[in-house]
């Protein structure tokens, strides 16, 4: 499969229908938990305290490099969360401390990696250009320098020129990531 042949389809797939297809969950209601904390997490009824999304019929666990990603779904199989796909890709790179940004299906995803270690991951709904505000807050929180530290933009179906033009007044080192989000999805879902 080539990334230019990926077709995004919105909707709510039914359980066990089209089982040869892979479904990517974009839900904002998920948890990334270090494996050494998973037992404590499982003892807490987190869905009552934080999110009702984990009360769906099936709670999926995606695993990657000593991390567990938990999210609720109606699908029994062929379901993977977008965070696992992106983390799996970035963890293979030998990285200095970098910030990553991608936008897919009206979801903003912000990530900080430092030498194959996930420092920060968050995703939320896109509203106008609120990713600029969140990037500024992220740089402030992690004491990053807007003139020196790099932002890698993982391109998607949003106009790359528009995103870069909105970021340039605030950030000086914006680099296009070598692969688009669709290339990453294609490679990680083989």
Description of each model-found segment:
Residues 1-190:
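Hydrophobic/aromatic-enriched cytosolic interaction surfaces used to assemble or bind macromolecules
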């Amino acid at each position: 499969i080539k990334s230019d042949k990926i077709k995004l389809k919105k909707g709510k797939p039914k359980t066990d229908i089209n089982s040869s297809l892979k479904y990517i969950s974009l839900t904002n209601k998920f948890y990334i938990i270090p494996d050494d904390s998973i037992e404590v997490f499982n003892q807490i009824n987190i869905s009552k305290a934080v999110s009702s999304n984990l009360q769906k019929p099936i709670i999926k666990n995606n695993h990657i490099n000593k991390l567990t990603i938990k999210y609720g779904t109606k699908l029994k199989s062929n379901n993977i969360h977008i965070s696992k796909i992106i983390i799996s890709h970035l963890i293979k790179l030998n990285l200095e401390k970098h910030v990553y940004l991608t936008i897919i299906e009206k979801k903003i995803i912000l990530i900080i990696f430092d030498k194959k270690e996930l420092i920060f991951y968050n995703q939320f709904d896109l509203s106008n250009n609120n990713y600029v505000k969140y990037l500024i807050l992220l740089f402030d929180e992690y004491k990053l320098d807007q003139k020196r530290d790099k932002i890698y933009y993982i391109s998607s179906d949003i106009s790359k020129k528009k995103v870069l033009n909105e970021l340039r007044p605030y950030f000086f080192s914006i680099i296009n990531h070598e692969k688009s989000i669709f290339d990453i999805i294609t490679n990680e879902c083989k």
